[in-house]
Amino acid sequence: MVLDAVLARGRTVCKHNGLLILSVLSVIVGCLLGFFLRTQRLSPQEISYFQFPGELLMRMLKMLILPLVVSSLMSGLASLDAKTSSRLGILTVAYYLWTTFLAVVVGIIMVSIIHPGGAAQKETTEQSGKPVMSSADALLDLVRNMFPANLVEATFKQYRTKTTPVIKSPRGAAEEAPRRIVIYGVQEDNGSRVQNFALDLTPPPEIVYKSEPGTSDGMNVLGIVIFSATMGIMLGRMGDSGTPLVSFCQCLNESVMKIVAVAGWYFPFGIVFLIAGKILEMDDPKAVGKKLGFYAVTVVCGLVVHGLLILPLLYFLITKKNPIVFIRGVLQALLIALATSSSSATLPITFKCLLENNHIDRRIARFVLPVGATINMDGTALYEAVAAIFIAQVNNYELDFGQIITISITATAASIGAAGIPQAGLVTMVIVLTSVGLPTDDINLIIAVDWALDRFRTMINVLGDALAAGIMAHICRKDFAQDMGTEKLLPCETKPVTLQEIVAAQQNGCVKSVAEASELTLGPTCPHHIPVQVEQDEDPAAASLDHCTIEISELETNV
């Protein structure tokens, strides 16, 4: 009997969490396979062939980013009134800024305690040859990308100021330029001869940097988010005239989520090759660990403190709910973030986990997640603060309190401009370093371990987005309950739900929404705490509770 119960329990767990279990196993298998193949000395060409299944996974996820962001923001904001959408937007952005600043503070405290720069040795390297970008240009590029000049181009390119060195010619003719030649003699060791040397003291040419407009490959997610959010708000104010476009966006969003559900079974297979391929590409682990081990430990410890202590504590204090249960619901999205190191590519999976497992109101998820994937980079902000102070420690540069405050502010601002793409933090790191006068070429010191740390900080970014959706669903539950009667659902968005899912939805901000948005018929097994509305036939005598059904047209629990 006990064995049968255990087997039945195991089958139930595998049935409901099969994809999650496969994802966990794929991460373990990928690590083992990668370290085993390192002993086989594969050529770069063979490694590229080996990474092909993982490359397909990345391409599938990136393919879904654009339609998902546009459709979710436009349909989500169009279904809200102006007051509700403005309150949700203000609370979401304020929460994101606050948690990002907390992440920076945690990073500064950890790097000050561990002091990893004392164990690292700076090697004399040549100039990297990378274009120099000032912090002013980087901040202006952030603002420019918020308002793309060409919306079609924004889907595959973003604005990027290019800085090129220019030799400044002296005024006047070349012969008028000041030039001095010094001739001096040096006697040889035996004293027989004197060698004459000429030293040209012509001053070197002055080099200035010229900024020119340019572009870089990659989707301008920030500009698309701004445009889609504006369109969604305007569609909501247009009333019935904007309904066709809203319906199109809702159906597009639903179809994308169905594609995600089908493609999800390929994810464990692709994760194996993504992780194993990255392990094959990395440098000698022993040499990297000896040089940057304390730095990596500092970043990971900061991410653990912020992601597993501070963010869950905020969720518990605000919602009075168990954060472990919530985090378990988005565990698959965290594993995809670990494999892809891209919060934007993980966006479809995060949607799926929040709607199916945590039963978050889909309108909140449609707004909070795309915005969070663009501006909420807690892990990136923490990493940039740690890296900046680490570089200062390597150079024996003492930072005063004012410079630490400058780092905290610039790291918070720079993380907002970091697109949800792999290793975007290295680009915005220039802003943080130049704000306190640190050499930007020293970014090369941390590149060796950035590929691994990028995956862990992406997990924290995705976790912060998911917890933010849960917190906003709790804070704005009354606003959405009052606004529930104004939303019209498409047939493609109505699905049957169980009583357990109704109770779970009530706990995530839908206390009155089930009754107010739906036409419910009282059934014999319906809990008494769920407000219902009895729908009777024309003949009262023919009405029987045994033939009544429950129809829920509001709650969406399966994608």
From Swiss-Prot:
It is found in: Photoreceptor inner segment membrane; Synaptic cell membrane. It comes from the Eukaryota. Glycans are attached at N190, N253. It is a multi-pass membrane protein. PROSITE patterns: NA_DICARBOXYL_SYMP_1, NA_DICARBOXYL_SYMP_2. SUPFAM superfamilies: Proton glutamate symport protein. Residues 115-215 are extracellular. Expressed in retina, located in both cone and rod photoreceptor terminals and in axon terminals of rod bipolar cells. One of its GO terms (biological process) is L-glutamate transmembrane transport. Its main location: membrane. Keywords: Cell membrane, Glycoprotein, Membrane, Symport, Synapse, Transmembrane, Transmembrane helix, Transport. GO terms for molecular function: extracellularly glutamate-gated chloride channel activity; glutamate:sodium symporter activity; L-glutamate transmembrane transporter activity; monoatomic anion transmembrane transporter activity. It catalyses: K(+)(in) + L-glutamate(out) + 3 Na(+)(out) + H(+)(out) = K(+)(out) + L-glutamate(in) + 3 Na(+)(in) + H(+)(in); K(+)(in) + L-aspartate(out) + 3 Na(+)(out) + H(+)(out) = K(+)(out) + L-aspartate(in) + 3 Na(+)(in) + H(+)(in); D-aspartate(out) + K(+)(in) + 3 Na(+)(out) + H(+)(out) = D-aspartate(in) + K(+)(out) + 3 Na(+)(in) + H(+)(in). PANTHER family: EXCITATORY AMINO ACID TRANSPORTER 5, SODIUM/DICARBOXYLATE SYMPORTER-RELATED. Sodium-dependent, high-affinity amino acid transporter that mediates the uptake of L-glutamate and also L-aspartate and D-aspartate. Functions as a symporter that transports one amino acid molecule together with two or three Na(+) ions and one proton, in parallel with the counter-transport of one K(+) ion. Acts primarily as an inhibitory glutamate-gated chloride channel being a major inhibitory presynaptic receptor at mammalian rod bipolar cell axon terminals. Glutamate binding gates a large Cl(-) conductance that mediates inhibition, affecting visual processing in the retina. Belongs to the dicarboxylate/amino acid:cation symporter (DAACS) (TC 2.A.23) family. SLC1A7 subfamily. This is Excitatory amino acid transporter 5. It comes from Mus musculus (Mouse). The lineage of its organism: Eukaryota, Metazoa, Chordata, Craniata, Vertebrata. The gene is Slc1a7.
